[in-house]
């Protein structure tokens, strides 16, 4: 009887202990605040580097307005380009800002799933490894 009682207690204690760890979630949300920061005001591209090429000047006259419905508008005095944006944390190793504009130059340069590097209320830093040539691309939005 004593052996059965000890065995039963051992089973109860063992089943109460769990090896699962909820802190090891595959998807992180470190940068989820991007969904509330981007729609607050207008932004401009303060840096766009594609490998060894600085393409920042191609966007110097454009202001970007990110809307809560996932649309984005890039606008200057003469031209407006509409696109979409979304935050994606479905990858197990990074969080991304996905930007999609038409294939109009120069906006085809920023159509990508950008890895979020850092976020503040005034600056968003992104990076990507180019699928074509493996070059590092850097994109920074700064709040106006």
Question: Model-derived features: where do they sit?
Answer:
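Positively charged n-region of N-terminal signal peptides that target proteins for export
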Residues: 1-4
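Sec-dependent N-terminal signal peptides
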Residues: 6-8
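C-terminal motif of bacterial Sec signal peptides marking the signal peptidase cleavage site
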Residues: 13-16
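Lipid interaction determinants
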Residues: 18-86, 90-144
């Amino acid at each position: 009887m004593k052996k059965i009682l000890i065995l039963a207690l051992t089973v109860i204690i063992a089943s109460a202990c769990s090896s699962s760890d909820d802190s090891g979630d595959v998807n992180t949300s470190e940068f989820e605040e991007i969904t509330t920061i981007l729609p607050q005001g207008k932004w401009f591209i303060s840096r766009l580097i594609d490998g060894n090429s600085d393409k920042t000047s191609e966007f110097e006259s454009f202001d970007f307005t990110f809307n809560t419905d996932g649309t984005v508008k890039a606008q200057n005095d003469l031209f407006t380009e509409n696109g979409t944006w979304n935050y994606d944390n479905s990858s197990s190793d990074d969080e991304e800002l996905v930007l999609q504009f038409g294939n109009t130059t120069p906006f085809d340069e920023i159509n990508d799933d950008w890895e979020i590097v850092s976020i503040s209320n005034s600056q968003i830093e992104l990076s990507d490894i180019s699928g074509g040539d493996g070059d590092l691309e850097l994109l920074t939005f700064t709040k106006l």
